[in-house]
Every structure is written in C-alpha cells, then in structure tokens.
Amino acid sequence: MTSEAPRVKNKNPAPIQISAEQLLREAVERQDVAFVPPKINITDLEELQEFQGRKRKEFEDAIRRNRLAMGHWMRYGQWELDQKEFARARSVFERALDVDSTYIPLWLKYIECEMKNRNINHARNLFDRAVTQLPRVDKLWYKYVYMEEMLGNITGCRQVFERWLKWEPDENCWMSYIRMERRYHENERARGIYERFVVVHPEVTNWLRWARFEEECGNAANVRQVYLAAIDALGQEFLNERFFIAFAKFEIRQKEYERARTIFKYAIDFMPRSKSMELYKEYTHFEKQFGDHLGVESTVLDKRRLQYEKLLKDSPYDYDTWLDLLKLEESAGDINTIRETYEKAIAKVPEVVEKNAWRRYVYIWLNYCLFEEIDVKDVDRARKVYQEALKLIPHKKFTFAKLWLMYAMFELRQRKIDVARKTLGRALGMCPKPKLFRGYIEFEDAIKQFDRCRILYEKWILYDPEACAPWLGYAALETKLGDSDRARALYNLAVNQPILETPELVWKAYIDFEFEEMEYGKARSIYQQLLRTAPHVKVWISFANFEIAHLEDDDEEPPNEEVASPTAVVRARNVFENALAHLRQQGLKEERVVLLEAWKQFEAMHGTEDTRKHVSSLMPQVVKKRRRLEDGSFEEYLDYLFPDTATDQGDKMRKMLELSRKWKEEMAKKKLEA
C-alpha cells in the first residue's frame, strides 16, 4: 500500500456499494460546526458590569439546575475572587456550605481563597467552623495545624492539637503532635503527650515509640520506666516477643548484659513457645555474644578473626572480607581495635583506577565515618575521616555521589549548613552527576530554600538539557509551590527540546499537569501537538480516553454519574475516527487493529447499537499468506484484510472467505439434521 491515498476523480457513490471514502466525505460535510465563543473586549465600566451580571446569571442558572454540584459553586466563588469581589465570593461559599456543609473540598477551597488573599483571621475562623462541624475529618485538622505552624503561632498550633486530641483520633495525629514538639525541642511536652497517647492507644508499637523517644533523649532511666510501665499496663494478653526483644536490645546497647539476660529469661517464661520463636533465636544469639561462657565465646571470635585474617593475607584487596572482619570487631565492642582494623582496611587502596574496583572500598570509608559519628560520637574525627576519603578518590576519573551526600548530611546534622552547601557545590563543580544534583536539591528542599532549588534545577538543565529528570523535577517543584504558570512554561520548554532521552515521560507529565489544573483545552492542544510529532496509536487512544474522562463547562450534563456526557462521547468518537483515517493513510495495519479494538471497547461502554455495528464493520479479517524468503523458501504469515481495501485481490479474498464461512455453516446444519 502506498503512503498516500489514491486520488479519486469520480466522487459519486457507486450504484451498489458505498465506499468508505464516500461515507467519510458525507460525514464531514454533514458535521456540525463546533461552537466558538466570541472574544469579548471590555472597554468601559458599564460593559464590565454587564459582563459580570451575565456571568453571574450563568452561574446562578447552573446552580439552580443542579444545586448539589459543588464544582459549580467553587468555580462561581473562584470567579468572584478573580473579579476582586471578596464579599460576593464569601457569600457564594457560604451559600454552598448551606447546601452541603460536609463537602471537604469546598471547605478547603474556601479556606485556601482566604489564605491566598492573606485574610488569616477569616481562614482561622473557617477552620474553627470546619473542625467543629466535622471533627472526624483529619485533613481539616492537619491543614489547620499546618497553617498555624507556618505562621509561627506555635501556641495556637498546640491549642488546635489539644482540641483535636479530645476526640481521641488515630495514631498519626498523636505522632504529628509529638513531632511538632520535638521540632521545637520541647521534649517535656512530648513526653507528656506520650503518656496520654499510650492511654488512648495502648498498642505495643506505641509503647516502643515512647521508649525510642526516651532513648534518643539519652535518658536510660526513663526508657526502663517506660518498658516496665508497658509490662504492667499491657499484661500477658497484649505483650509480644517484639516488645521484649526491643527491651533486651536496649539493655545490650547500654552494656547492661545481666539486665538483658534477665529480660530474656522472663520473656521466655512469660510467652508461650509457639509465639516466641524469634525470641529464642535472639536469646541464643545474645548468649553467643554475651553469655557466661566468655572463654568459649572469645575462642569463637578469635577463630573467626583468624579465618578472616588468613583470607586477607592471601587476598589483601578482598573488601568483602574486610567488611566482615569489621562487623566482627564492632560486635566485640572494642573501640581501639575497631579503629585499628578500619585503618588497616582503608590503607589497602585499590591498585586499579576503575570505579567498579573502588565501590566496596568506599563502603569501608562510609562505615568508618558512621562508626565515628554514631557509635563513638566523635564528630571531629568523623569529619576528618570524611575529608580524607574525599581527598583520596580520583575525582578526575570518577567519583561517588553517595560519599559527597553523606558528608553534606553529616555537616547538616552538625548545623553547619554553609559547610554542607560548599561541599555539595564543590562536588558539582568537580563532577556534576545527576545523583549529586538530585541530592543537593533534596537538601535545599528539606530546609525550604526553594529559590536555591530553582537555581540548581537551572544549572542541571544547562549541564544536561537532554535529560528528562531536571525538567520534570523543576516543573514538579513549581507545581508544589503553586506556581502553575512557571510549571507550564517549564513543560513547554521541555517538550520543545530537539533531543530528549525519554520525551514520552515529559509529554505525559505535561498532560497530567494540565488535567489536574482542569485546563482541558490546553491539555487537548498538547495532545494535538504531540500527534503532529509522534502520531503513535497509543497516543491516539490516550487522547480519546482523555476526551471521555472529563466534563467541560459547556458539555451536556450526563443523566447520572456512571454515564459519560454525550458531548464527551462525541469528542472521543471523533478522535477515534481521525486516528483511523490517519492510520489508513499511512498504511499501518497492525496499528489499525489495535485502534479498532480500543474503539470497540469504547463503544461497548459508551456507544449505541448502531455505533457498535459500525465499528464491527470496520474490523479486519485475519488471513494466512505466504511469502518468499531470501533463500528461496516460503514462510506463512498472518495478514489483515480490511473491508475498505480497494483492490481486486482483496475483493477476491473477501469473497473466498465469505464462501468458506457459508460452506461451514451449511455443513454444521447438515450434521445437526443428521
């Protein structure tokens, strides 16, 4: 089949059979012209007032037709806000709340509008009304406390949390309150919340959270009191092996081995054996490490140490063995021995300057840094280890983003943000890798420095404009910040790039963005732009699904929520028809079959009997054909014979298939009669 459709001189219909071309031509000629709303130019105040009155009448009519459609109310209120008619906007939202005060998006939209216009007291009053009427809706409470915290009103934030806790919400609320107090280093308040928390939700997990909190605060006596209080409060019915294992491991970390042994023995006597298999395993492991037979255990450790040292003598650059030896020494707990082992391990610098040969070696450095920071709590020594590791790596050949990022996060934990920034900036200057860009951006995003995030995204795009990750990440950041125009501009720049690694991801994200913004016309334009550059059958099908998935303002209202709008169905059907015409013109048979199958499913859900028959009439017949190969042999293959194939050979093939089908039906009837 040629790439272009043959030019038909005689456009009159055939006396017997009507061609597909004639059907399409008549369909186009009879097609109604789409309504294009006139462009309005407002020149004076009187015209503006007349326009506003007309729009208000349209909104009021839409509300009268379906007063329960909250989308009309929200669009009405938003329009009034766009006109700077704040009193009218509030009136619209209040009327909507009178209709349905349980519709959460309406409350959020109302509050968001007040916050955007910096009417904080109005927003606070609305939150009070919302949580009073809907105290079981957690989203309203979360938004409320988030607003108060962002405003710096920590006292008000606590008051909101206390109001919320009176309703005894789920665990996430309590943990959010605790995390808020910990962010402001109010550990005593957090401790008081935990005391109330375990009364309302006395699960083992919550007691363990409290114990972990006390351990992080560095008060071992309080941790023990929490565990003992949990034993008294929960009793045998609710305690499990995980609780006792956590208690014992805490005592092990405190080097209180006799206490840990007592806990294990008590738990074994307390818990039934069927529910304490992991407890027995941990106790056995504990006794092997810290049991009474210290000589035996020491012999076992020495034996394993000798085995590792022998292996390292034969293969001094076997870094997996070094890691096993270091793990063994860390389990022994001798800090000086552990340091000596680390120094011996890092002295074995790989002889080959290749990244794969350095990977496991760098892990030794990372473990060394974590050991000094976490186990020994020697911050200065940990910093020195990080710096020595960075000096050693040949950055001109390769680098390890994980090391740079861990060092930056280490400095952040020490509250040296400038040093962390300089470290990451130095890393990007020496070796700009995507992982470093991503880590640096996450670092700035974590401390809410969004302008710096923008600068980093711009540098990333300049460095690698063909990569999709910086474009998508930048646009997602602007979307998160609520700047839709900047996000849209970024997506537009991305799709217009001459070369992209995976452009389909950018197109999909762009379309999803416009769909979430309810800018359906812009999303449609993006689909049309994509089809001009990549007219793939999947894009056509996605375009049709998009048309049926949304309801525009001028669309005909569906009879119920389960049925699509007739106007949307017509739009989607037009997309399928255009796609079929394009694929027919390009001579893409398999793609036409895929499209027709999707169209058939669409008509099965949204079409009528006539439209289903029409699509079925377009389905091809599968025929077997033979073709000659280069070596002179033949092979069979499947081909598609479409009803609109305008060739003599196709007509003969269809007639032959029709005769074959009739013969089979006659033979089947004869068998039944016999």
UniProtKB/Swiss-Prot annotation:
BP GO terms, sorted: mRNA cis splicing, via spliceosome; mRNA splicing, via spliceosome; spliceosomal complex assembly
Q: Which residue intervals correspond to the HAT repeats? A: 50-82, 84-116, 118-150, 152-183, 185-216, 218-253, 255-289, 299-331, 333-367, 377-413, 415-446, 448-480, 482-516, 518-549, 567-608, 610-643
**Pfam families of this UniProt entry?**
HAT_Syf1_CNRKL1_C, HAT_Syf1_CNRKL1_N
The listed locations are: Nucleus
Which Gene Ontology CC terms are recorded? Answer: nucleus; post-mRNA release spliceosomal complex; Prp19 complex; spliceosomal complex; U2-type catalytic step 2 spliceosome; U2-type prespliceosome
Q: Family, per the entry?
A: Belongs to the crooked-neck family.
Q: Which residues form a coiled coil?
A: none
Q: What is its main location?
A: nucleus
Keywords, ordered alphabetically: mRNA processing, mRNA splicing, Nucleus, Repeat, Spliceosome
Membrane spanning residue stretches: none
Gene name on record?
cwf4
Q: Which Gene3D superfamilies does the entry mention?
A: Tetratricopeptide repeat domain
Quaternary structure per UniProt? Belongs to the 40S cdc5-associated complex (or cwf complex), a spliceosome sub-complex reminiscent of a late-stage spliceosome composed of the U2, U5 and U6 snRNAs and at least brr2, cdc5, cwf2/prp3, cwf3/syf1, cwf4/syf3, cwf5/ecm2, spp42/cwf6, cwf7/spf27, cwf8, cwf9, cwf10, cwf11, cwf12, prp45/cwf13, cwf14, cwf15, cwf16, cwf17, cwf18, cwf19, cwf20, cwf21, cwf22, cwf23, cwf24, cwf25, cwf26, cyp7/cwf27, cwf28, cwf29/ist3, lea1, msl1, prp5/cwf1, prp10, prp12/sap130, prp17, prp22, sap61, sap62, sap114, sap145, slu7, smb1, smd1, smd3, smf1, smg1 and syf2.
Reported function: Involved in pre-mRNA splicing and cell cycle progression. Required for the spliceosome assembly and initiation of the DNA replication.
* Name by which UniProt lists this protein: Pre-mRNA-splicing factor cwf4
